[in-house]
Amino acid sequence: MDIKGKKFVVVGGAGLIGSHTVDTLLKDDVKEVVIYDNFVRGTQENLNNALRDPRVRIFEVGGDVMQTDILQAAFEGADGVFHLAALWLLQCHEYPRTAFDVNIRGTFNVMEACVAKRVKRLVYSSSASVYGDAVEEPMTEDHPFNNKNFYGATKIAGEAMMRSFHHRYGLNYVGLRYMNVYGPRQDYHGAYIAVIMKMLDAIDKGESPTIMGDGSEAFDFVAVEDCALANVCAMKSDAVDSFYNVGTGKRTSLKELAEKLLVLMGCPSPIQFAPRSQATLVRNRVGSAEKASAEIGFTSQIDLNEGLQRLIDWRASHKAEVAARRHAVGLFS
């Protein structure tokens, strides 16, 4: 699709990947970007820069994928939709009923609204979680679904529904399976922070980062800015009824990750190792980047060192801004 002069709705547009997708869209000559978000995980702060652009607005009524009438109203006149709203992996583990409602019923509602409002193209955010542990590396898009957690199950269901809607209603969609996403605007406090943030928290306190296991578990860490680029590449492409890995294609063990963070933070602390938890969900997951490069024109632009430095710089800046705001209103703790 030629996105010039087109209107887009970003469902989950205030979240980590969603807000960066909004930023990336605005680099093109699009007509309008509507953000549809209930702000449970996303924040308006993530949109501060985007909202300065007159082409961007937050949908003024609702923002929940369970509100089907409001959702359809938001899609009125939209040329393309990015569906990024979902409960995250650990939230799905703790609250599977809510995960079913949001990730499965919510995705059905998005597809139904696209068909009802004749949206020309839908980009669906799936996940590499559909693969589970790697049987072979790098994992191509034909890798078997070896998933064993509920988050991955919801994404598998979403993919199956997308395909069925394409064949029954002609839904023009493409799906993206993100690898391990990190970057600016990522949560760094609360119960659901990712492994990189846990390591940075320890380093901040002068403690050694702790790895569960021997550190050999390896993943494909992809910068959130690259995920946003992949979303826009997918929207522009001619690919239909297909799924693509979004990653770098490069393998990084948790031990290597911790070592990189220690160097970038200028910290000489040794790495600590602890017994591996029985709850460890996946131990190895590195995806092939070839199909995405060949068919939707996406290639990762940010290497791990650069991406981690961007995250570290943003995290430090954001923490300072939050502290300054708290001080200004008399909240010193």
Indicate where each model-derived feature is located.
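N-terminal Rossmann-like NAD(P)+-binding domain of SDR-like oxidoreductases, especially those catalyzing
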Residues: 1-179, 302, 310, 318-324, ...
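Residue-level signal for the nucleotide or nucleotide-sugar donor/cofactor binding architecture
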Residues: 42, 66, 94, 102-105, ...
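Active-site loop immediately N-terminal to the catalytic Tyr-X3-Lys motif
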Residues: 96, 188-189, 238
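Heptad-repeat alpha-helical coiled-coil signaling segments
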Residues: 109, 186-187, 217-219
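Short glycine/proline- and charge-enriched loop/turn segments
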Residues: 137-146, 194, 273-274, 289-291
